[in-house]
């Protein structure tokens, strides 16, 4: 639960090895020691390294096993996150899979893996988290969507379609939870230089995880429901969304 002056005291990260999520946790915690963080992710070196980095910043870190490809892990993981420690102030839904885009539109298994991780698991976790936050009577959800969901592009339309669905769900969840006083912040970043995008050509308006974290923190504090990172990406995507198909398909995107 937030402290007497409204500072966040406990954060849960579903997808606890995400570069953007870790940068956001550091930004939300500021320099205050003792903030409690639960990292829900697959066990391994990446989760251990993430935990160590946050502990070095003065946070109290716990780890929970969670695998977005394993349907049986969702209830167990989220129950563990909520049933140990203080009330949860913020839950970040930060797991995701970029995948091989050329394979994804030609291979059923590759396509379904993207759907399972980016959409089905995200929806299931949203339902479970919403129930927990309603039960405790407060909290916020940060849902990591993507600008890729705004309009299908030849280069990543399978990934983009899963993010479009995830985005719609969390936008609607925000409507549903408004009466309970629970904020749902949908984050639509453009290209972010992270481990997931390593090896890809850097796109215009690319950002670091720390830059995205600043946008997220500001949006959360302001009570926003949607933020773009960088903010100018909103206008770029608005233009692209309204271009005629004959023009859009000639663009190198």
What are these model-predicted stretches?
Residues 146:
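Residue(s) in the substrate-gating loop at a strand-loop-helix junction
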